[in-house]
UniProtKB/Swiss-Prot annotation:
Its EC number is 2.8.1.12. Catalytic subunit of the molybdopterin synthase complex, a complex that catalyzes the conversion of precursor Z into molybdopterin. Acts by mediating the incorporation of 2 sulfur atoms from thiocarboxylated mocs2s into precursor Z to generate a dithiolene group. Pathway: Cofactor biosynthesis; molybdopterin biosynthesis. It catalyses: 2 [molybdopterin-synthase sulfur-carrier protein]-C-terminal-Gly-aminoethanethioate + cyclic pyranopterin phosphate + H2O = molybdopterin + 2 [molybdopterin-synthase sulfur-carrier protein]-C-terminal Gly-Gly + 2 H(+). One of its GO terms (biological process) is Mo-molybdopterin cofactor biosynthetic process. Substrate binds at residues 107-108, 123, 130-132. This is Molybdopterin synthase catalytic subunit. Heterotetramer; composed of 2 small (mocs2s) and 2 large (mocs2l) subunits. GO terms for molecular function: molybdopterin synthase activity. One of its GO terms (cellular component) is cytosol.
Amino acid sequence: MSKESRIFIEISENIIDLNYWYKIVSDDSSGATSSFLGTTRNEFKGKSVERLEYETYEPMAIKEIEKICKTILNGFENDIKKIGIVHRIGNVPVGESSILIVISSGHRKSSLEAVHYAIDTIKSTVPIWKKEFYTDGSENQWKGNCESCHFNNNNHPH
């Protein structure tokens, strides 16, 4: 199985189907499947959030996510089985998910560490922007990726 046949990436306006993505990375040789599901929360810095809107330059976003996946496969060559990453674009209401990362591996440590690496690196390198829409109609702002997440160990909110 080539590395490319172990990587599954999608940018989509559709609601993320967890079961579909878990099936994609399912592998008889894996003993663990780890995931991260990013969800739109209802507040940010005390302001009530209605929804998020995501935009991207899709070819570049996919290329950057592929690089991240290949780095993961090279770093855990004998243990990572498959990687699935889907990121939504367009409107994502409160309670719905904007990103899912699912990674299968022979052992739990590898997939847990790989998921952590993937989300931090996606947020710091992939050209995806979000705009928060507040319930009070106050000014909405476009926000880029959190540049310091991957390089700074501070525990700050996204």
